[in-house]
């Protein structure tokens, strides 16, 4: 039986079809917004997974190129690994839904959202969050709290819900708000230096817009939702919990109140060893329970420390930043480097400048076709003092890299202002909280060191939240470190400049957070951000005047678009010869803009000279110094400009009569010629005789 329900959101139809497809899934839906369609399937294992201390939720965001009428490139002609955008979209779905499952639920749950049709005006990533929540609510899986998502833009000073393609191009804000009926769940934002008050209002606007979609989900559940399964929730053995708490409570408290990180960790490890020695035999098959109890005890101590004692694990005030350090130019051959240190968190960011041809080509369902500015983030095991295999970037690394990239994107100069491709790589050297925001600061330093004329310096800070069990008490923390992140309830990352916010990413372990938290976090983040920017300015306040000696030099020139074919030549013959002869890289745009790049300045000048010659218009009546390229019985062909030849008839070779062309010129001779005519077929007629006469007349004068 196909159950259908529709509503209208921002002037477009939101529709769900349940029961039509995926009959063997716990729940399968077609959810559409306009002509964008998401196929969602949700399933759960029948029994909890044994021996784990986490909720095994798997969220997959699958892109199908047929959704936009494309055939995948390459030899195989099918979709391969997920794109970075798909990974980020999957993370957004996961971060919204995960806290809403029952605490202690250990059954494997898989949510698969497959993009099967895309209308450019309606973003599939927004629909995927709504579709996933809706499918879970309709299923028998014990997920009962609907969550909704909208995108908020600012166009001509007004908030707009789910702007279309044209609207997104105009909008100065790209904000995703995910919420339940009562609280905000997740925030993602990128903006052009948005003032704090405006951002807060935009989040409130987005929350209100989410309520319409939540009401739609509730209506769907009431009409055709499945009966929910009774969850089997993980619970610690009460006797074990009592024994461990009585034995270790005082020791845990004493250890957690140690301010120095390494000393505190060593003390906690010692407590764990003592507990294992004391109860290892009695609870040999319940070591996971012991670990869970100790974790809960640590968390309780940290919460009491913050909410009751009003002190942080390292003794800082709630709004205090750890000691800061900034350095530039620490690597001799790179194009730009920035070393940013905040407490025990340290990131080195390296900037590399390349030619315009080195942009990243994107092959996916996204609107963007290429990227000129990119940021990559690496988080090796040594950054936390651990031994880990070095593999490719995971979801976390991709997410952190994209977040720092978004923070700087509005500040990057245009292609016309700075004709380079820009790649930043942030290497996390030491991690004790908020390395993604340290990457923003390191990126600013590296860009300024590389001579990139960004609008102004940017910085990022991570805010945290600690709440009481009943949520009656809460404390917002500035610049959270590892222990506060681990035992805390929220990670609220804000980046921007002195003028406003350029990026936000917020997720929580709770079932949402209040607007009071949103306001306090955003306002406190500004104070911290300005402090960090002051420190950056002490190190380097403006971009270096010149790019590195080891960076390519790029010059821009404009040519008539009709002349592009002359520069490229048949099969690329002409442009390839220029590249081969001068050692440059050449990029030509459809509007006739030409970018010439090389580390050899002389090569750039030579290439520009050749291109100018190729595109210069031959004019009748002008005199040129040309080279004889071919001799026939009736005259000589002379190249007056690159790839432009004309004929000097034998009668026009000299003032006197010429019997044989070879008597006057030979191949390779350079001679003065005058353009006498360009016929309607573009053929150029030349005269050496007229050029000689004109030259003699000038000499007589």
Swiss-Prot record:
What does the record give under GO molecular function?
3'-5'-RNA exonuclease activity; magnesium ion binding; polyribonucleotide nucleotidyltransferase activity; RNA binding
Top-level taxonomic group: Bacteria
Per its record, the protein catalyses: RNA(n+1) + phosphate = RNA(n) + a ribonucleoside 5'-diphosphate
Instruction: Name a Pfam family for this protein.
Output: S1
Bilayer-crossing residues are: none
Q: InterPro entries, from UniProt?
A: ExoRNase_PH_dom1, ExoRNase_PH_dom2, ExoRNase_PH_dom2_sf, KH_dom, KH_dom_type_1, KH_dom_type_1_sf, NA-bd_OB-fold, PNPase
One of the GO biological process terms: RNA processing
Q: Which cofactor does it need?
A: Mg(2+)
Write the record's keywords in alphabetical order, separated by commas. Answer: Cytoplasm, Magnesium, Metal-binding, Nucleotidyltransferase, RNA-binding, Transferase
The record, for CDD domains, names: KH-I_PNPase, RNase_PH_PNPase_1, RNase_PH_PNPase_2, S1_PNPase
The subcellular location is: Cytoplasm
Q: Which residues form the S1 motif domain?
A: 621-689
The UniProt entry, under Gene3D superfamilies, shows: GHMP Kinase, N-terminal domain, K Homology domain, type 1, Nucleic acid-binding proteins
Limits of the KH domain: 552-611
Q: What does this protein do?
A: Involved in mRNA degradation. Catalyzes the phosphorolysis of single-stranded polyribonucleotides processively in the 3'- to 5'-direction.
Q: What is this protein called?
A: Polyribonucleotide nucleotidyltransferase
- What is the native source organism of this protein? Clostridium beijerinckii (strain ATCC 51743 / NCIMB 8052)
Q: Which taxonomic lineage does the organism of this UniProt entry have?
A: Bacteria, Bacillati, Bacillota, Clostridia, Eubacteriales
Q: Which gene encodes it?
A: pnp
């Amino acid at each position: 039986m196909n159950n259908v329900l529709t509503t209208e959101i921002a002037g477009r139809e939101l529709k769900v079809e349940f029961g039509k497809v995926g009959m063997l899934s716990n729940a399968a839906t077609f959810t559409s917004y306009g002509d964008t369609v998401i196929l969602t399937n949700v399933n759960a294992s029948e029994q909890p997974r044994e021996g784990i201390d986490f909720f095994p939720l798997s969220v997959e965001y699958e892109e199908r190129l047929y959704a936009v009428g494309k055939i995948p490139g390459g030899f195989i002609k099918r979709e391969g690994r997920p794109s970075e955008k798909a990974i980020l979209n999957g993370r957004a779905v996961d971060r919204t839904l995960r806290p809403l499952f029952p605490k202690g639920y250990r059954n494997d749950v898989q949510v698969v959202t497959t993009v099967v049709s895309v209308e450019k005006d309606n973003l599939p990533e927004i629909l995927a969050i709504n579709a996933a929540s809706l499918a879970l609510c309709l299923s028998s899986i014990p997920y009962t709290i609907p969550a909704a998502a909208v995108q908020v833009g600012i166009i001509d000073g007004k908030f707009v819900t789910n702007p279309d393609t044209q609207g997104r191009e105009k909008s100065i804000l790209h904000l995703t708000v995910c919420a339940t009926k009562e609280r905000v769940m997740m925030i993602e934002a990128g903006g052009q230096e948005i003032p704090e008050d405006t951002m807060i209002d935009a989040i409130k606007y987005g929350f209100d817009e989410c309520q319409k979609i939540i009401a739609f989900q509730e209506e769907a559940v009431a009409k055709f939702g499945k009966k929910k399964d009774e969850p089997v929730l993980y619970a610690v053995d009460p006797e074990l919990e009592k024994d461990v708490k009585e034995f270790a409570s005082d020791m845990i408290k004493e250890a957690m109140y140690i301010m120095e990180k390494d000393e505190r960790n060593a003390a906690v490890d010692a407590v764990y060893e003592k507990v294992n020695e004391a109860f290892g035999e009695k609870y040999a098959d319940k070591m996971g329970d012991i670990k869970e109890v100790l974790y809960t005890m640590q968390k309780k101590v940290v919460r009491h420390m913050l909410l009751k004692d009003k002190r942080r694990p390292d003794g800082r005030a709630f709004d205090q930043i750890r000691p800061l350090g900034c350095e530039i130019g620490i690597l001799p051959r790179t194009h730009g480097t920035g070393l940013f240190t905040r407490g025990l968190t340290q990131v080195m960011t390296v900037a590399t400048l390349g030619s315009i041809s080195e942009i990243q080509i994107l092959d996916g369902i996204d609107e963007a076709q290429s990227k000129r500015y990119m940021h990559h983030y690496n988080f090796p095991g040594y950054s936390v003092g651990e031994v880990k295999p070095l593999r490719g970037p995971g979801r976390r690394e991709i997410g952190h890299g994209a977040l720092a990239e978004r923070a700087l994107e509005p500040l990057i100069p245009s292609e016309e202002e700075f004709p380079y491709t820009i790649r930043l790589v942030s290497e996390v050297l030491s991690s004790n909280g908020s390395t993604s925001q340290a990457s923003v600061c390191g990126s600013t330093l590296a860009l300024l060191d590389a001579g990139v004329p960004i609008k102004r310096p940017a910085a990022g800070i991570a805010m945290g939240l600690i709440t009481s069990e009943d949520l009656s008490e809460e404390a917002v923390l500035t610049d959270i470190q590892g222990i506060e992140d681990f035992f805390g309830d929220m990670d609220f990352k804000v980046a921007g400049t002195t003028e406003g916010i350029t990026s936000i990413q917020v997720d929580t372990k709770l079932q949402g957070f209040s607007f009071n938290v949103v306001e306090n976090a955003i306002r406190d983040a500004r104070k911290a951000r300005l402090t960090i920017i002051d420190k950056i300015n002490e190190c380097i306040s403006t971009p270096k005047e010149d790019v590195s000696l080891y960076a390519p030099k790029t010059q821009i020139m404009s040519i008539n678009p009709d002349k592009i074919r002359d520069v490229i030549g048949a099969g690329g013959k002409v442009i390839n010869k220029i590249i081969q002869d001068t050692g440059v890289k050449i990029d030509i745009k459809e509007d006739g803009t030409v970018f010439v790049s090389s580390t050899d300045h002389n090569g750039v000048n030579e290439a520009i000279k050749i291109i100018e010659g190729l595109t210069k218009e031959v004019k009748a009546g002008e005199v040129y110094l040309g080279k004889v390229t071919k001799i026939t019985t009736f005259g000589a062909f002379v190249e007056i400009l690159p790839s432009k030849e004309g004929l000097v008839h034998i009668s026009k070779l000299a003032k006197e009569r010429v019997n044989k062309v070879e008597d006057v010129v030979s191949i390779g001779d350079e001679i003065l010629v005058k353009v006498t005519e360009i016929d309607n077929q573009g053929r150029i007629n030349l005269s050496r005789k007229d050029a000689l006469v004109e030259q003699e007349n000038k000499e007589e004068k």
